[in-house]
Amino acid sequence: MKFTLPKLLSKIASPDLALRLIEIMLSYKAEWVKGFAGTKGSFCPRFRFNYSDNVETVTQAVVAWADRLGVRLLSLLCNRLSDIANLEAGYTDLCEWIDSSSFIRHAIEDHEQDMPKEGTFCVMIDCAREIGRKLFLANKLELNQVFTLIGSKCSLVKRLGLY
């Protein structure tokens, strides 16, 4: 019998183990992608694992833990999204000098418009939006908690629709 990560996630009972598996599922590596038509290249995130499941299955498996993991899961996703946006913006090492939060919104918009839904960034955005929505509807998360959770990355909050 073949187990995939989303199927394995549905079999786990421990929230701590589930959070660790989700962290592994959504781990990525940065690849250098050459530019086209004279543009310079950039770093691009790629999932470390090739899924035999489709994107909806991966998203459903992660979102299914929203009730039990709550803010811990949303925090993991938002921090990962911020790291990827900073990587792509090229300001990872200059966070102290440049307000990278202004670039996060553009990175998210570019991915949503130009990338297929299978993109690493898009899967995490879909998961974060759905989990944030569930937490708000269940009154488990207030706006001030979202801003505390994400820090100064206001554009990330707005772009995810968590305001």
Language-model-detected regions and their locations in the chain:
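Extended alpha-helical scaffold segments
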Residues: 1-163
